[in-house]
Amino acid sequence: MKRLFAWGAPLFALVALTLSLFSQADTKPSTIDSTSANYQQATLAGGCFWCTESDMEKLPGVVDVISGYAGGDVDNPTYKQVSSGKTGHIEVIQVTFDPKIVTYEQVLDNFFRHIDPTDDQGSFVDRGEQYRPAIFYHNAEQLEVAKRFMMEIDQLGIFKKPLKTELIEFKKFWPAEDYHQDYYKKNKVRYNYYRYASGRDQYLDEIFGADRNTHPKTLRQWIDEKNGQANVKAYVRPSDEQIRAKLTSLQYKVTQRDGTERPFDNEYWDNKEEGIYVDIVSGEPLFSSTDKYDSKTGWPSFTQPLNSSYIVTKDDNSLFYTRTEVRSRFADSHLGHVFNDGPAPTGLRYCMNSAAMRFIPKQEMAAQGYGEYLALFK
């Protein structure tokens, strides 16, 4: 599996051996009860389980990730047996997650964004069916979610090739040897060397962009954005005179002069009513109460927009560091900023100004022309 390039092996082995003496002492057994009835499991194959384990453990809502083997004919297989390709097993990770925090689709979303799901002959530098991508579904619901989501990803076309990720009924999981568990923590140098040499990150950068870690975007966001572009309505920006007459001094300062209102002293920071938020100038739909959460900042915060086609982001260098500004597409109103410290499923915090938005309660949405969004509240 982890075949390192010969030219770097001697020096690398010396460094890795030295560091491993120190890193192994840091390994601690998990104190989390991953068998709780409140949790669910996903069993996924995406090539080297050193890498897939590392990537999946970073997803909020994931309780535990164990590297192992599934799908074969031999009980309690060893790594040597599985890597030979003769047992029928595939290298997998078994993911225990809290469905109150992260859904099964969101687990799959994270999984697909860290593998090559189009290669059924292996995974990056590791060749053979024991490294092919697969989803071992635990029940009929997982199967349906996976089939539907994969169809949407194929239609999106982001991978440029058809998905060849196999759907296999889950039967049995065997944990891999202890030294494979949390390998990226215990053997950082060797892991980083292997990961770079495998070509995994280079491939993912090509598909999702070199900023995929600093500005993550889920496949669901890509899909919704593509679908949303087909359903975008044109909104009109009023004249400057009309805007001045319509807005309060604070609303004008925020939207037209890129101002910021005071935290905890604005209209919507603690609004818990169901409904949507639209641009105060043009009325274009921006955010939903279904994506609103308490960020403890004193400003209304959301994990994602209603339709990303209605917002525009740009670099803001007005302070001593670069922020990402959020503006409305048609009115070009300054709305606020987006940060990478939000909760699941997006990991984003759209920190908005109440003064830039108008709230429409759910019961008034149809009458005001926003009935298409009522399905969000069913």
UniProtKB/Swiss-Prot annotation:
It is an enzyme of class 1 (oxidoreductase). One of its GO terms (biological process) is protein modification process. It holds the Pfam family PMSR. It catalyses: L-methionyl-[protein] + [thioredoxin]-disulfide + H2O = L-methionyl-(S)-S-oxide-[protein] + [thioredoxin]-dithiol; [thioredoxin]-disulfide + L-methionine + H2O = L-methionine (S)-S-oxide + [thioredoxin]-dithiol; L-methionyl-[protein] + [thioredoxin]-disulfide + H2O = L-methionyl-(R)-S-oxide-[protein] + [thioredoxin]-dithiol. InterPro entries: Met_Sox_Rdtase_MsrA_dom (IPR002569), Met_Sox_Rdtase_MsrA_sf (IPR036509), Met_Sox_Rdtase_MsrB (IPR028427), Met_Sox_Rdtase_MsrB_dom (IPR002579), Mss4-like_sf (IPR011057). Residues 40-197 are annotated as: Peptide methionine sulfoxide reductase A. Its EC number is 1.8.4.11, 1.8.4.12. GO terms for cellular component: cytoplasm. The active site is at C48, C351 (nucleophile). Keywords: Multifunctional enzyme, Oxidoreductase. Residues 240-362 form the MsrB domain. In the N-terminal section; belongs to the MsrA Met sulfoxide reductase family. In the C-terminal section; belongs to the MsrB Met sulfoxide reductase family. PANTHER family: METHIONINE SULFOXIDE REDUCTASE, PEPTIDE METHIONINE SULFOXIDE REDUCTASE MSRA_MSRB. Has an important function as a repair enzyme for proteins that have been inactivated by oxidation. Catalyzes the reversible oxidation-reduction of methionine sulfoxide in proteins to methionine. HAMAP family: MsrA (MF_01401), MsrB (MF_01400). This is Peptide methionine sulfoxide reductase MsrA/MsrB. It comes from Vibrio cholerae serotype O1 (strain ATCC 39315 / El Tor Inaba N16961).
